[in-house]
């Protein structure tokens, strides 16, 4: 499997820079198999999710909460640096991406500042070739609240503002730790969640803290050589029980977003209900838990595009993305959504 198999051309005008006025105003592309190995593509509104779910189905949300994970600072030499938390590994330790003119050495000190003129210092204690291990002087979360900035994705070109502070979080966000939102969940508001519940559709949660590695480009053309980044996840017992009951009663497990799917499939593969996962899903992967997937449109050559291609079929996804571009769907984090079911679970 080659990286170039997952490339496509996207007009920049289709990259959503701001959220729509209401969460549920987005469009929804339903991708179905027609029995002839072709994709049947249905243009819908997100509110039509109410007609796509069925009594007895289980919607699984990622309840991670985006933290203010971007920090600005200076090296001891005065050079400007930017830190982006990749994942938090302890009360006072993190792995981070650092944007600087040169690679920082172990033992280097970086002085972090905020707009109020306050400062604190961190020490570089390790480097694995991609991410730096950094020691903080105090609790990481408390320092991020005072010094951090909301880490909007690199393709969103404006500085974070009050709108982003509200709309780049899902309404189910509960557990702080993500540096990017689980974007499929951004389409839901409290009202539509209640309507779904009234239909007899159950809801459950997992936690997977989306790391900065989700935006790191895949550099290996041969995908078998790609090293997937790690992300921390946890699945409560009540969610595992809900999945088991759903399967026994003939319902479908519907993952809201690729992060929910990765958490569920990581548990199914390892038997562990929590920990760090570097599960890399590409075409040929045998899914064990998730039947249907609600997801946004993903970047070219990204591991998330590979995941949805594995889930719904490469030809179906190529056709769906081409259709979405022609119909001017909005792409990426603040964009529109797709509803996919696994090929063996999709009926004509």
Swiss-Prot record:
The answer, when asked if Transferase is one of the entry's keywords, is: yes
Kindly provide the name given to this protein in its UniProt entry.
S-adenosylmethionine:tRNA ribosyltransferase-isomerase
Question: Catalyzes what?
Answer: 7-aminomethyl-7-carbaguanosine(34) in tRNA + S-adenosyl-L-methionine = epoxyqueuosine(34) in tRNA + adenine + L-methionine + 2 H(+)
- Outline what the protein does: Transfers and isomerizes the ribose moiety from AdoMet to the 7-aminomethyl group of 7-deazaguanine (preQ1-tRNA) to give epoxyqueuosine (oQ-tRNA).
Q: In which pathway does it act?
A: tRNA modification; tRNA-queuosine biosynthesis
Alphabetically sorted, this entry's keywords are: Cytoplasm, Queuosine biosynthesis, S-adenosyl-L-methionine, Transferase
The entry's localization annotation reads: Cytoplasm
Query: Which gene name does the record give?
Result: queA
Quaternary structure per UniProt?
A: Monomer.
Listed InterPro entries: QueA (IPR003699), QueA_dom1 (IPR042118), QueA_dom2 (IPR042119), QueA_sf (IPR036100)
Species this protein is from: Polynucleobacter necessarius subsp. necessarius (strain STIR1)
């Amino acid at each position: 499997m080659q990286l170039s198999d997952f490339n496509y051309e996207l007009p920049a005008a289709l990259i959503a820079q701001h959220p729509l006025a209401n969460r549920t105003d987005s469009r929804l592309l339903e991708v179905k198999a027609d029995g002839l190995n072709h994709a049947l593509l249905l243009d819908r509104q997100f509110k039509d999710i109410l007609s796509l779910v069925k009594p007895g189905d289980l919607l699984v949300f990622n309840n991670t909460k985006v933290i203010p994970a971007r920090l600005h600072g200076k090296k001891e030499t005065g050079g400007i640096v930017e830190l982006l938390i990749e994942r938090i590994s302890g009360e006072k330790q993190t792995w981070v991406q650092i944007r600087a003119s040169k690679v920082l050495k172990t033992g280097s000190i970086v002085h972090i500042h905020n707009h109020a003129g306050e400062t604190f210092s961190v020490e570089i204690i390790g480097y694995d070739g991609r991410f730096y291990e950094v020691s903080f002087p105090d609790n990481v979360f408390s320092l991020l609240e005072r010094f951090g900035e909301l880490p909007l994705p690199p393709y969103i070109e404006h500085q974070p503002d009050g709108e982003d502070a509200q709309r780049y979080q899902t309404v189910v966000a509960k557990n702080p730790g993500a540096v990017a939102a689980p974007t499929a969940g951004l389409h839901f508001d409290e009202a539509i969640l209640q309507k779904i519940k009234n239909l007899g559709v159950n809801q459950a949660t997992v936690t997977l803290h989306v790391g900065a590695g989700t935006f790191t480009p895949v550099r290996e053309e041969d995908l078998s050589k790609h090293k997937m980044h790690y992300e921390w996840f946890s699945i409560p017992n009540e969610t595992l029980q809900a999945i088991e009951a759903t399967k026994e009663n003939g319902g479908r497990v519907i993952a809201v977003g690729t992060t929910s799917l990765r958490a569920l499939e990581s548990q199914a593969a390892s038997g562990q209900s929590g920990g760090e996962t570097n599960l890399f899903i590409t075409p040929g992967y045998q899914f064990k838990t998730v039947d249907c997937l609600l997801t946004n449109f993903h970047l070219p050559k990204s591991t998330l595009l590979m995941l949805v291609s594995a889930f719904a079929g490469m030809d179906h996804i190529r056709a769906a993305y081409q259709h979405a571009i022609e119909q001017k769907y909005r792409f990426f984090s603040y964009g529109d959504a797709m509803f996919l079911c696994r090929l063996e679970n999709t009926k004509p």
